[in-house]
């Protein structure tokens, strides 16, 4: 044996061996119980980073342990089409080539998307293979595979028929860069807030002299103001309720109204009410019957409804900068204060999210989610750490309907077709939609449209939220919807052999940031279509941060090069180092010293093995060290029991630290020294 452990050479040898021999392939074996782990499908745009390393190391750990214990272990890999992220990548790629998306047909753009996917989409899976992830690589699933696409469409139609999916107009989160709607869970906030300015504007009274001072962080939206609200209990303004003031710059009169939502302590205690551009203002507007005027285009520029020609076509943030001078010129700006503000940004593009009144497709979540709430709160599906149940409980008791439509082309196209009158027909295929249309025409004594060849219907241009496909992950990686029963609205699990054998899976490893985006919705979908839970346990990892507490990211320049570290410490050294410092749920402060400890540990095991291999084999019973053997055997069994107990209770870092102590101290420093020839 070589004196020094060559991690790079050994790991390469075994990862290639496992792939060539399909070591981790799993098929149904009724003589053994299954142990299944589903990989949280990384984005098709993704490359391996330290978050993936931690997550996949834990999954690999669980799956190899199960395999050693005799389970039929199956780790299912796959990738997500990642609608917003992928479309943004392709749009950027085309921009570099001088091509605009708007100049392409839908089919032409999708050809570019598939071309990009084929070229770059498998990178992260290839990287996982390289580092020896023990997946069944014959089971790779992509969320735009034909069978998966059909399943997503089938679920949309089914939920529409059951009354859970509807189309409605309400305030949504709008990404001006991607020009698409976002769910609340796709909006992120800087923990420390962001620097902003509070503008104190003068709204002059229509009757008499003087003005009302109103504080706002968004002066560019004054053109959509419909009222100024004050708290009905605020003695300063009671006498003004019902009077009118003028919007600066356009001199449009609006009323002063009373609403208990207004915070008397913020700013001046007066709130400009802009129903089209703020969710709280929208709700105030609904209570008071205010008009809703949207002054922003989809790209975040001001439109002609702002009634101020100089700003039409300009970006919202440019207007915010320029409006300050305009307000000063007419003496309508009292002062500006620097503040720290909570600003929502798109998780995918980092664009500041714009509240926008929009017609979108929604899922009614209140009734659909009841079973999921019950099974988590009763620990039928267990959360680790358990304190995440508190967050789950709060979110579920305040659950809102899910906006599932996205103004994109890459993804699962919404299966709704519109006639010339704006009526829509939902079906799994265009043929089904045309059958409904023909029935409608017949019922209204109108002539036949001539079927699909007549071309009278047009399909909805939008696609579904990415999560509206990935919530079916535990079902469709096993092709479950092939056995969907239209009469019952369920999957016939008894006919789906893989689903019946592998579901529920044993554990899923993920971050708490997608508890609602993904974990909760998978539980909802599984009970809706199989009456089974998707997994027994959910193991929430923490976020990998630097020593300053910042999340590791390329943008901050604080994310080390993974492959340089693999060359330096070996993949097993990194796995041990990362898992040993990651108590369940707690964020991890990345320190290269932990990887060094992992590398030294693998070297220690190698050297111990080299030492034993150098000894001569002696026939017969060794009575000289019998007491030592008895002592060590008892110690070994005690440590094995403790190790397994820690793992079963998901105390992974404790298990690894105890293992380290046992190998380094008990085995190497004592036992081997005591029995060596």
Predicted ranges, named:
Residues 31-32, 40-41, 76-87, 140-148, ...:
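Short, solvent-exposed turn/loop segments enriched in Gly/Ser/Thr/Pro and often Arg
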Residues 64-72, 93-106, 126, 130-135, ...:
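Secondary-structure transition/capping motifs at alpha-helix termini
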Residues 52-54, 279-284, 520-529, 659:
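Alpha-helical support elements that line or immediately flank enzyme active sites
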Residues 27-90, 152, 215-217, 257-284, ...:
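N-terminal catalytic cores of NTP/NDP-binding nucleotidyl/phosphoryl-transfer enzymes
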Residues 202, 260, 288-300, 407-411, ...:
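Alpha-helical recognition segments enriched in aromatics with Gly/Pro capping
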Residues 4, 13, 17-21, 91-211, ...:
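Residue patterns forming the tRNA-binding/recognition surfaces of aminoacyl-tRNA synthetases
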Residues 208-273, 279-283:
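Protease-associated
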Residues 1-50, 73, 347, 605:
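Non-catalytic terminal extensions that flank enzyme cores
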